[in-house]
A protein has these predicted regions:
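Short, surface-exposed patches at the edges or C-terminal ends of soluble domains, predominantly
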Residues: 1-398
Length: 398
């Protein structure tokens, strides 16, 4: 993979350009530090505000000898990471036409507003719907982000202070079911042989039939999933008792999709003739063949910060449990696939994968395996001793 990556870098004429949007409360440069620094090894990265500017994502080429010009892309892909404020119709139109002219988009969207910040000072908080004015646009392209939260017994651990030992706080770790560990939902090269991806307050995504648009599931929850509607009470008191596996029965909820093909414009049959016929805008009602990835978790690209010194940590690394999840690998694969196709991804995905144990089965059969691992060696030693004594006695009786 490294050899192919070097050859690819040397042979291409210029680095592909990635735009990361600002202006709608998205994750900032510090929160995306490790993600962007890693991207900079292969791409040019710009933080941009759309702000109603028609030429921020596309531009017109120089006229040819017949006076005709084309719409060109300023960026090979656009990343939208956890917006918190609504998109106005101008910005939606600019994104729509960027897509229509062949642009690629990585959406990381939270349909439900929920945060651990509120649980720092209280035992509970409420997850509520957030209106970003993007539902109609994403629905037009073929997906529907559901207003729910996914709880999964196969989840990341959360450190909770439970007391003090020798004047130092005692931290115990509990599985926080609102932080599912997502697994590959298909054999697509983007997620093949991938480590679990840590999600935070993630939602499910449904698809809508759109002619000419092919959909591939990328990430899903485990077989022990529960769906909570909104408003959702999120309380730390749930950690005081064991979960009832019977209510975690909504297996394999999809949280990320790849959409490829020719998309219909949200603004088809909605724009006045002076706009649709404008050469400056170059309005298109159907896209060129292109692709997008939609993830129902806005925090997937956010890195943690060191507790004492405050510097950004590698994306996917959890400093509390000292585990590294597959967030960085997945998002780099996503960008690479959108920009360059699956050539390099197919090579990189041949790396070995760390297989996570099924936490629910481990807990339910803990005593069985403890007894097995404790008693079996003792039983084998006793049997070996008895067999040795019998053989020795038999030999000497002759």
């Amino acid at each position: 993979y490294k050899l192919a990556d070097i050859i690819n870098k040397v042979t291409r004429l210029q680095r592909p350009a990635i735009a990361i949007t600002e202006g709608h409360g998205e994750l900032d440069e510090d929160q995306l530090y490790d993600f962007t620094q890693t991207l900079l090894q292969n791409y040019r990265v710009d933080f941009i505000e759309i702000n109603g500017k028609i030429n921020v994502l596309t531009r017109r080429s120089e006229p040819d000898k017949n006076g005709r010009s084309d719409i060109l892309l300023n960026y090979d892909a656009v990343v939208i990471a956890k917006p918190q404020q609504p998109f106005d119709e101008k910005d939606k139109f600019i994104l729509d036409q960027y897509l229509m002219h062949g642009g690629k988009i990585l959406w990381m969207i939270d349909p439900v507003q929920a945060s651990m910040d509120s649980l720092q000072t209280a035992e509970s908080t409420v997850g509520v719907d957030i209106d970003l004015n993007l539902d109609d646009q994403l629905f037009k392209y073929g997906v529907k982000l559901n207003r729910n939260l996914l709880l999964d017994l196969n989840a990341a651990a959360l450190g909770i202070r439970t007391g003090e030992t020798g004047g130092r706080p005692q931290i115990d770790f509990f599985r926080w079911y609102y932080f599912p560990l997502l697994e590959a939902a298909s054999r697509h090269p983007m997620v093949k042989n991938m480590n679990a991806v840590k999600a935070e307050f993630v939602s499910s995504i449904d698809t809508v039939i759109r002619e000419g648009v092919h959909k591939t599931p990328l990430l899903k929850t485990s077989g022990y999933t529960r769906i909570a509607g909104t408003p959702a009470l999120i309380s730390l008191t749930m950690l005081q008792s064991d979960p009832d596996p019977r209510v975690y029965n909504r297996s394999g909820q999809i949280a990320a999709w790849l959409l490829e093909g020719q998309f219909p414009s949200l603004f088809a049959n909605r724009m006045p003739p002076e706009i649709t016929s404008s050469g400056e805008i170059g309005f298109k009602e159907e896209s060129k063949p292109t692709a997008m990835i939609v993830i129902a978790d806005g925090d997937m690209a956010r890195n943690q910060f060191h507790l004492q010194q405050g510097y950004p940590l590698p994306l996917g690394y959890d400093q509390y449990t000292r585990q590294t999840f597959g967030n960085k690998a997945f998002l780099l694969n996503a960008i690479s696939y959108l920009v360059e196709g699956d050539g390099l991804i197919s090579i990189r995905s041949r790396e070995l994968k760390l297989r996570l144990l099924d936490a629910n089965k481990v807990n339910s059969r803990r005593l069985q395996w403890q007894l097995f691992n404790t008693l079996l060696p003792v039983a084998l030693i006793i049997l070996s001793g008895l067999l040795f004594a019998w053989l020795r006695k038999k030999r000497f009786t002759r």
